Amino acid sequence: MARIANKAAIDAAWKQVSACSEKTLKQLFEEDSNRLSGLVVETAKLRFDFSKNHLDSQKLTAFKKLLEACDFDARRKALFAGEKINITEDRAVEHMAERGQGAPASVARAKEYHARMRTLIEAIDAGAFGEVKHLLHIGIGGSALGPKLLIDALTRESGRYDVAVVSNVDGQALEEVFKKFNPHKTLIAVASKTFTTAETMLNAESAMEWMKKHGVEDPQGRMIALTANPAKASEMGIDDTRILPFAESIGGRYSLWSSIGFPAALALGWEGFQQLLEGGAAMDRHFLEAAPEKNAPILAAFADQYYSAVRGAQTHGIFAYDERLQLLPFYLQQLEMESNGKRVDLDGNLIDHPSAFITWGGVGTDAQHAVFQLLHQGTRLVPIEFIAAIKADDTLNPVHHKTLLTNAFAQGAALMSGRDNKDPARSYPGDRPSTTILMEELRPAQLGALIAFYEHRTFTNGVLLGINSFDQFGVELGKEMAHAIADHPENSDFDPSTKALIAAALK
């Protein structure tokens, strides 16, 4: 497959996108009585309302031509086939094999690895490690953000084990867990693709020392390795039955579907984890089969590119009106910004348009009393998303959940409609875009579909920008410099400011 297939056609399509007429959201609703049905997509137990975005038939036609110019169908097919679309690292991209999509051999391998994970979970449940109440999961980046999201969202009330996820190398993070967990009833899962990640290995060593200090006879025998480098885990003395591999071709930010999801599978039970996978697979089918104008990830990417490239928006906000999804914005920060925060295209040339949004967000209704002032009356355009479950899971007075939902819907309406006032300080300009994503209830299948939606949206944005969404070279330089400072703090090659900081704190 060519890297940038037809630059002239892509440039022409972008010009057509930029030339589309500008209308307010109110005008778009007034001119099209079918707008709501045209821009609402229901799939995989989720309801996406894109009608409060400035998309219309003219823009959709232009963006579909851009898809064609970018050879989108072929690139999507290559993604689903697990081909080597990570061209800068010459790697296949195979996280979707965990959900049953890809080369038959890769799907079979994923099933084998899932079976190993299930066997270990059943052994833990059966008492193979004695009485187990706690799991300490140690990882960083994608090895921690995904499991942490799943556990916080799905196991607050029904978790079978008490799971803590530690990613920060700051010792206070581990100490907080040590205060709460009984070391004799704790297992430790160490998640690292290479099984050499410096922060993760340091935290794992400290966890082993904690167990030894409290008289655990065989701390190593209570360690579980989640890795794409099982040989390295074996070298450290971890028995094969406690090594849960995943494929080298699975990137960290796409890895929660693999053995990296072990802590969530342990806490949820295997059936719950399987439902998560099935939800992701349902969104896969939708993304592959639905026409662009009724395809949720594609429509979301169209809106992203319109607001970024045409309207100059630099950020987008994710606001979950569900306390259990408070970690979703942090998870999406890595997914979107590490994937598409690039400056060169597939041919190594500087890209012509802004790359990924800065992703941020919060939880409603808290965020309304913190950041919505800027969203309603500030000078920056910030497309936002509201995410909510129709049914409550708490046992309190139903007025709690009703108030939560009414606030979410009211914010979207207010952002769109605005309100005039003789006093400029009390005037709301309106015409500010939002997308609302609803689910009947927050369950593993719905969360799996939601995460897969964001994955496919991120991929589509990458194709439209002509970039590789699956490498992350931008994280390397800082790590290299950290090693250099640790090994040679006296090094005179650093800038004057950094040398002064080293002198003040590290000598």
Swiss-Prot record:
<dbReference type="InterPro" id="IPR001672">
    <property type="entry name" value="G6P_Isomerase"/>
</dbReference>
<feature type="active site">
    <location>
        <position position="369"/>
    </location>
</feature>
<comment type="pathway">
    <text>Carbohydrate degradation; glycolysis; D-glyceraldehyde 3-phosphate and glycerone phosphate from D-glucose: step 2/4.</text>
</comment>
<keyword id="KW-0963">Cytoplasm</keyword>
<dbReference type="InterPro" id="IPR046348">
    <property type="entry name" value="SIS_dom_sf"/>
</dbReference>
<comment type="function">
    <text>Catalyzes the reversible isomerization of glucose-6-phosphate to fructose-6-phosphate.</text>
</comment>
<feature type="active site" description="Proton donor">
    <location>
        <position position="338"/>
    </location>
</feature>
<comment type="pathway">
    <text>Carbohydrate biosynthesis; gluconeogenesis.</text>
</comment>
<keyword id="KW-0312">Gluconeogenesis</keyword>
<dbReference type="InterPro" id="IPR023096">
    <property type="entry name" value="G6P_Isomerase_C"/>
</dbReference>
<dbReference type="GO" id="GO:0097367">
    <property type="term" value="F:carbohydrate derivative binding"/>
</dbReference>
<dbReference type="InterPro" id="IPR035482">
    <property type="entry name" value="SIS_PGI_2"/>
</dbReference>
<dbReference type="GO" id="GO:0006094">
    <property type="term" value="P:gluconeogenesis"/>
</dbReference>
<dbReference type="GO" id="GO:0004347">
    <property type="term" value="F:glucose-6-phosphate isomerase activity"/>
</dbReference>
<feature type="active site">
    <location>
        <position position="479"/>
    </location>
</feature>
<dbReference type="GO" id="GO:0048029">
    <property type="term" value="F:monosaccharide binding"/>
</dbReference>
<dbReference type="GO" id="GO:0005829">
    <property type="term" value="C:cytosol"/>
</dbReference>
<dbReference type="InterPro" id="IPR018189">
    <property type="entry name" value="Phosphoglucose_isomerase_CS"/>
</dbReference>
<comment type="function">
    <text>Provides a gateway for fructose into the Entner-Doudouroff pathway.</text>
</comment>
<protein>
    <recommendedName>
        <fullName>Glucose-6-phosphate isomerase</fullName>
        <ecNumber>5.3.1.9</ecNumber>
    </recommendedName>
</protein>
<dbReference type="GO" id="GO:0006096">
    <property type="term" value="P:glycolytic process"/>
</dbReference>
<comment type="similarity">
    <text>Belongs to the GPI family.</text>
</comment>
<dbReference type="InterPro" id="IPR035476">
    <property type="entry name" value="SIS_PGI_1"/>
</dbReference>
<keyword id="KW-0413">Isomerase</keyword>
<dbReference type="Pfam" id="PF00342">
    <property type="entry name" value="PGI"/>
</dbReference>
<keyword id="KW-0324">Glycolysis</keyword>
<dbReference type="GO" id="GO:0051156">
    <property type="term" value="P:glucose 6-phosphate metabolic process"/>
</dbReference>
